[in-house]
């Protein structure tokens, strides 16, 4: 990734704001990594569309936005780097709206909120003419506009594995979002795969972690909407489903 200067694999983190846990996933923007983009978009309830205040929408912006709109995700447009000397705020705002119309966005999607940010300064504002003092306007908009997960913790467990990690102590680690049910350390689960009817392996959850800040925190149980990293299945792969 460093060599190419682009994001290839998604990065997960989570922050707490006003007693709400917000999972944030930085996904690739390039069509070359469409499979990764597809998996990540199915893990989220909404998207922040990051657009450079000087460069405007890029070709990869179109690709990711199109997939997000097709999945009927709510979109918050974040025009970033507004402190650039060559920033074109009004023009870029128009370019984003034109892109949304070109992609046949619904009326609701065309009315997506816009936030004007400086990532370097850590500020956000609802107006292109006002410099923010912190990122509260961005997080308030997320809480107001992006729907919460709709899973049922009393339903059978359902987790789609969207990424794989590895640790020399516990081996392969599956990463995914809990859609329904509750995942608990020590519980017996079944690993299946939609594309391989013969794969039905029973195993035990050995360790369970949630993403917090730039690291992971061990937990004993997790609920719908939580993005978790778990071990216990030696041959788990992307696309597997973990169920009870």
What positions do the PLM features span?
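Structural and coupling elements of P-loop NTPases
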Residues: 1-244
């Amino acid at each position: 990734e460093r060599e190419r200067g682009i994001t290839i694999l998604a990065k997960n983190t989570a922050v707490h704001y006003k007693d709400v846990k917000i999972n944030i996933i930085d996904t690739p923007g390039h069509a070359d990594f469409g499979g990764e983009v597809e998996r990540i978009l199915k893990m989220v309830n909404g998207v922040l569309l990051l657009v450079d205040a000087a460069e405007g929408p890029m070709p990869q912006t179109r690709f990711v936005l199109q997939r997000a709109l097709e999945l009927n995700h709510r979109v918050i447009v974040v025009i970033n780097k507004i402190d650039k000397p060559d920033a074109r705020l009004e023009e870029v705002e128009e370019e984003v709206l034109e892109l949304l119309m070109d992609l046949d966005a619904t009326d609701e999607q065309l009315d997506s909120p816009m936030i004007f940010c400086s990532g370097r300064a850590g500020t956000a504002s609802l107006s292109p003419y006002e410099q923010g003092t912190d990122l509260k306007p961005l997080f308030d908009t997320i809480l107001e506009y992006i729907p919460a997960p709709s899973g049922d913790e009393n339903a059978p467990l359902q987790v789609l594995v969207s990424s794989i990690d590895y640790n020399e102590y516990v081996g392969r680690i599956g990463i995914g979002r809990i859609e329904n049910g509750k995942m608990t350390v020590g519980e017996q689960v079944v690993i299946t795969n939609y594309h391989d009817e013969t794969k039905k392996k029973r195993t035990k959850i050995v360790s369970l972690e949630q993403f917090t800040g730039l690291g992971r925190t061990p937990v004993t149980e997790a609920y719908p909407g939580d993005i978790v990293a778990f071990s216990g299945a030696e041959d788990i792969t992307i696309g597997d489903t973990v169920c009870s």
